[in-house]
Amino acid sequence: DHHFVLSANMHGGALVANYPFDGPNSGSYSASPDDDLFIHISLAYADAHPNMESGGFSNGITNGAQWYAIFGGMQDWNYIWEGDCDITLEQHEIKWPNSNQLPGLWNDHREPMLSYIEEVHDGIRGIVTDAETGEPIVANISIQGIDHDILPDPENGDYYRLLPAGTYTITAQAFGYLAQSETVTVPL
């Protein structure tokens, strides 16, 4: 019963890794608070693909709204409401490829999918509990400079937060407790 922290939607009709945000204006870049992270995980997929960078998008990735705006898309919803970093993987220029093309598509996307899944290990994790009772605390976990907080699992207090390599100040705060901050480094 843990929250997802990384997921992907798979579509056809283009060859690109598409990341949030998908709105508000079509043709305009719409950065999420975790824009650097979304670029990083999108590139992890695109760079492992044999020809995604030749799909008409710079480095094989695009910001959703910069490509075309939609509202109520899964990747934006997952990020905003669940803290799940979700991108849309457009896997082939043809929306409905012939069945005889599927083995080749699998071969093209197998390693990129594995590279993408490995990104789940980049970031931080921890457990927030009461020092005296050991009971989990539903604390707000914030990263200085990134306006997108997460909550730990209420049953055991654990949390996972994807972050690209860098140094971050993490703060946990909950009603009735003193806020606790730590500076951590996420390695390359």
Model-derived features: where do they sit?
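Metallocarboxypeptidase
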Residues: 1-129, 138, 159
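Short loop/turn segments at connectors of secondary-structure elements within structured domains
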Residues: 120-122, 135-137, 166, 178-180
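Generic short beta-strand
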Residues: 126-127, 149, 170
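Solvent-exposed strand-loop boundary residues in beta-sheet-rich modules
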Residues: 132, 145-147, 176-178
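A short, solvent-exposed beta-strand micro-motif common in secreted/extracellular proteins
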Residues: 157, 165-176
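Structured interaction patches on ligand/partner-binding surfaces of diverse proteins
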Residues: 175-188
